[in-house]
């Protein structure tokens, strides 16, 4: 199945899945599952991938070589997102410590007492036993594979490597 993913189809698939993932995160946030510092940072890859994959999808017909190069970039970005999601999931499972920005302390004085700090080491929600950070790792890894498959596609619409 992945061998049929030309650059345009791969880019479009990434656009759709990345958009759905980010919209899902916003819906969970609106439902009261406030994101932690690491959760918000993980969204950065999606903020990049959504417009970039749309641009690649639109331009792939006229510039397949450029689209393939762009998909390699997306593969690296989403691989980084998968690693970051796995790191965050590890923090939630207490396998390792998270950054200091993920816990509340009063060392900053009174103004910080009004600021809500969501702990990064507590999963706000688990779906089928996997936290949202874990799902981000899985989805990002799948998107990295899709991007790589699209970049490596050797069809009639692609330029040979």
What are these regions (language model features)?
Residues 93-133:
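Extracytosolic (periplasmic/ER-lumenal) interhelical loops and adjacent juxtamembrane/interface segments
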Residues 5-16, 62-82, 145, 149:
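Interfacial segments of alpha-helical transmembrane regions
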Residues 20-29, 79-95:
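C-terminal TM-helix exit segments that contain a strictly Trp-centered aromatic cap at the helix terminus
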Residues 34-48:
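Loop-to-helix transition at the N-terminal end of transmembrane alpha-helices
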Residues 117-161:
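A hydrophobic membrane-anchoring alpha-helix module
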Residues 27-37, 160:
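Membrane-interface helix-loop junction between the first two transmembrane segments
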Residues 53, 71-85, 101-109, 140, ...:
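Hydrophobic alpha-helical segments of small multi-pass membrane proteins
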Residues 54-63, 148-155:
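Structural signal for the C-terminal ends of transmembrane alpha-helices
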């Amino acid at each position: 199945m992945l061998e049929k993913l030309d650059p345009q189809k791969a880019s479009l698939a990434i656009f759709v899945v990345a958009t759905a993932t980010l919209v899902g995160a916003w819906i969970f946030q609106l439902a009261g599952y406030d994101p932690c510092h690491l959760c918000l940072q993980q969204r950065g890859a999606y903020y990049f991938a959504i417009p970039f994959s749309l641009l690649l999808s639109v331009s792939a017909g006229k510039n397949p070589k450029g689209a393939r190069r762009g998909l390699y970039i997306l593969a690296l970005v989403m691989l980084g997102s998968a690693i970051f999601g796995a790191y965050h999931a590890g923090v939630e499972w207490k396998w390792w410590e998270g950054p200091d920005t993920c816990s509340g302390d009063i060392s900053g004085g009174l103004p910080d007492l009004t600021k809500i700090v969501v702990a990064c080491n507590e999963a706000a929600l688990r779906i089928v036993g996997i936290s949202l950070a874990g799902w981000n790792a899985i989805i990002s890894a799948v998107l990295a594979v899709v991007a790589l498959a699209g970049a490596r596609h050797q069809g009639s619409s692609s330029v040979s490597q």
